[in-house]
Structure formats: C-alpha cells, structure tokens
Amino acid sequence: LKACKLDERALSTLPPGRFLMPGDLDGSPALTFAPLPALAERRPRPGSLQAMMERRYEAYKTHVVKPFFREHITRLDRQIVLIDAMQALNAGPAAMADLERAVTEILACFRPGRGNFLTDLFSRRIDRILVAATKADHLHHESHDRLQAIVRRLADRAVARANFTGADVDVVALAAVRATREGTVKQGRETLPVIIGTPLKGERINGDTFDGKTETAIFPGDLPDKVDTVFDPSVTSPDGGDPAIRFVRFRPPKLERTAEGVTLSLPHIRLDRALQFLIGDHLA
C-alpha cells in the first residue's frame, strides 16, 4: 500500500486506511490481516490461516471502522472531500482513473439507504459535499479553471457511478495555505506565467533536484483544454519523456509580522469560498 501511494503510482483507492495511518493502532493485531488467494466458498477450517484472517478482518470492521463512523461521520450534515489531483495528474491517466474510483467509493459511503454496515449507522443526512482539489497554489491562476473542470468531471462521474442523490455536490480548487506567489519569465519572445516558491528538499524537475532552501520560479506546464485528455491512457508526453505538466511540493511560507509585531494570517486560495458553500447558510 505504501508503494502504491508513492508519486510513481499515486494511487488513491488504498484501503484499509489505517494500514497507511495506523495512529494508536501501530503494531496492533487489528492491523495484521491480508487478502488470500481465491478459496472455496465454504467456512474456513478452525485454526487455519484463512479463519484467522477472516476473524481479524471482521474485528477491524467492528472495532475500528464502525466506531469511527459512529463517533464522527454520522454526526455530520456537511462534508469536504480533499483530493490530491496534482499527484494524480503527475502520475498519469491510470492514477486519475483510480482517483475517480476512490471518490466514488467515498460518496457511496454517504449514500442513504445503501444497506451496508456503514450507511446503516447514519442518523443524519449529509446535504452538502464539497470535493476540493488541494494545492491550487502549485498552479498559476490561469490554470485554476481547468483544474476545477477536471475535478468537476471526476466528481460528476463519481456521483453517477455511486448512484448518489440527495445532496448538493460542488467542486473547488483551493489551497488552505498558499506556499507560492505568481510572476512571469521571459523565454525568447514568449512570456511564461510562473509560480515562485521554495520546493521541498528532494523534489525534482527535468533531472534537477531542489535543496529545500532556494526560492525558484517554476513553469509547471499548462493543463489541457480538453478535460478527457487527462483520463485517456492513449495520451502520452510528446517525446515519450517527462510529462507536459509537472508539479513539485513547496515549503509553506514564513509567517510575517507587521511593524507593531502582529503576526499576519497565512495566505490561502478560495478557503472562503469553501466555507461559504459548507456553512454559509448557517451564518446568514
């Protein structure tokens, strides 16, 4: 699961989630089960490996998954689903298709009347869901509309596949903390829109590795006009090498203070719009 999550594959459908983020269950037998090869459809023999795997999986659902939903999710009537579209775009169409699959499965968990062990726990109806593509600051604002169009297409297909109804679903490209600023760079007769920030140590573009200290102007590339392009496995980079779009991770900005010593809030992108959609009606 950890290998599948790395940038090379950037997969998103990676349950059980606690295997990647064990928290207080780190080292617990509750996280020591695995799928087995196809076996005959009969009850496992007592004391067998199959019986132990089945018992631990059922215990995981009972003691880890259900309490999480019962204590947290079931009390919500608004939900925000954060997706790392940038990482998936870096990895290509297969990662984008898997991201769509993950969003579908998430929405299916919120679908009323589905009749599985999760949705039977719901006592409240979720009436607004925001699908938010994070790290919008890794793109120039000229590409934000295209990013939102990609996420809209992904969300619409996920809603249809999950047969999800009864809630308003919106999308937004945002950055809770803006780690870059924008600028332009002359390249011959062409003026390129760039983002300026400090890439994390070890991030790479075209063979160059960043040291985590140097501020750099980066042209991440343009997202395609046609949304379906990023989901089409037949589309590759023109020369078969690095992709036409490439994003790196940036260090957060330094906190700034006024002359009076007051610490300023961190900059963001569209966090206000996200809050307006999720809770604006409660504040009117």
PLM feature spans:
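Switch- and interface-adjacent substructures of P-loop NTPase systems
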Residues: 1-124, 140, 158-159, 175-179, ...
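Class I S-adenosyl-L-methionine
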Residues: 169, 192-198, 212
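Long, contiguous domain-sized segments
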Residues: 174-177, 181-191
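GTPase G-domain guanine-specificity segment
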Residues: 138-163
